[in-house]
A protein has these predicted regions:
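Nucleic-acid nuclease catalytic cores
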Residues: 66-91
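Mg2+/Mn2+-dependent nuclease catalytic core
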Residues: 50-68
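Conserved catalytic cores of phosphodiester-cleaving nucleases, focusing on short active-site segments
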Residues: 33-35, 41-51
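Arg/Gly-rich low-complexity intrinsically disordered repeat tracts
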Residues: 117-129
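Acidic-basic catalytic patches of nuclease active cores, encompassing PD-(D/E)XK
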Residues: 1-24, 38
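Short strand-connecting beta-turns/loops that link adjacent beta-strands
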Residues: 38-40, 79-80
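Charged phosphate-binding loop/patch that engages nucleotide di/tri-phosphates or the phosphate backbone
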Residues: 97-120
Length: 129
């Protein structure tokens, strides 16, 4: 499955997060990953590989993100090794209808900053509110 390669990249590039891979057959629409950190709690991530101009979502996946819009994210990747993008789960309907739009983050370091906003002096990144 193409998402398996993205999963390996997530583990490699975001080791500060405790990840649990969720079995999608057990509950339709539930995202692929459950992330956790002591300082930021739980959040979900749907993994997508883009092979056309649109990102394909099942109706169950769209429903999940519409009903759980906070602390849910979508990591999308094309075949280009540098093409990693992070989107808010609340943008799922736009992504399904129109394809990739302006992402919240477009590199592993930006994704890390969005998922784990600095706990010291800085306010949370807008994408994580």
């Amino acid at each position: 499955k193409p998402e398996s390669k993205v999963w390996q990249e997530v583990k490699k590039n975001l080791p500060e997060i405790t990840w649990t891979r969720l079995e999608s057959w057990a509950s339709l629409g539930v995202p692929d990953l459950l992330g956790y950190t002591d300082s930021h709690g739980f959040f979900t991530v749907e993994l997508k590989v883009i092979s056309s101009k649109k990102i394909k979502f099942s109706p169950h996946q769209i429903s999940f993100h519409v009903t759980h819009p906070h602390r849910s994210f979508i990591i999308a990747k094309t075949l280009d090794p540098r093409s990693i993008k992070l989107y808010s789960g609340s943008s799922v309907q736009e992504l399904a209808a129109c394809g990739p739009t302006l992402p919240l983050a477009a590199s592993w370091s930006e994704i890390r900053d969005c998922l784990l906003p600095a706990a010291c002096c800085l306010p949370p990144v807008a994408c994580c509110l």
